[in-house]
Amino acid sequence: PEPDEAPRMVRVFQAAALALGGGSVDEEVRGGGAVPAARQLVLAFAGCCALLSGPRRYRAPTGAKPLAWHLAEAMGKEAAPDLLRVLNAMLILSADHELSPPTFSARIAASVGAELHACVGAALAALSGTGLAGGCDRIEDTLAAVRSRGQLDAWVARVVRDRARSSAFGIESYPQGDPRAALLIRMAREHPRPGLRAGTLLRFVDEVQARVGVPPRIELGLVAACAAWDLPPGAASALWAMGRTAGWIAHTLEQRLNGFFLRPRGQFHAGPQGGAVLKSQAT
């Protein structure tokens, strides 16, 4: 990225995971097993978050501190209790969410004997899509471009015109609203001095909901909480990926215990123009 541009942290984490790995499950076991490898991954990702602020270089976590504390330090923030509370909330709320595409990717890799770093790397590759953590980056990019009431109105009008069909609003799993997003947005509203970025985003959420009635997704909740605590751009997708990583590690270990391959099956069917269409079904 340019010097003043935030890196896409999911891609940074993916590169870090693959650089730290590269061995086999046997080598992982000889190195002490999955727990040391998991700790190495999570702490490395925390150190990578220093790329979001200050001199934009890796900062190795030091001392026996909670993960949220390491993250605050990496992003150039004082580890105040209120910040640690919201960081922990974002990590916990992001940790697991059914069998999402990234989680399924991690489990498929684990089922065929990939080592831990490779399983997490596979999941991160899926998470980087704009329909998932990439959605946080898109919201932050749009928010950064909103510098007037007219630009905010145009953003609201665009979303309303599309009936809020975006990665920011509406999720089939929660027809009454995503409770993860609701909690994070409430925390953002409760901040005594949320700042301009958060205020603009919260007005955007309120106006879209008033016109369309579609509740926000976790992406908006993460960006709102990060903006309220003045975390640097890119922090929302980074925190989502870090929370998810803990879940993927657990899924990887569980899948290994199952002892069978996850192999989706495919059937070819005649297409409308005479070609073949592959329809897949997980088994």
Tell where the protein language model's regions lie, with residue ranges.
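Hydrophobic alpha-helical bundle cores within soluble ligand-binding/oligomerization subdomains
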Residues: P1-T283
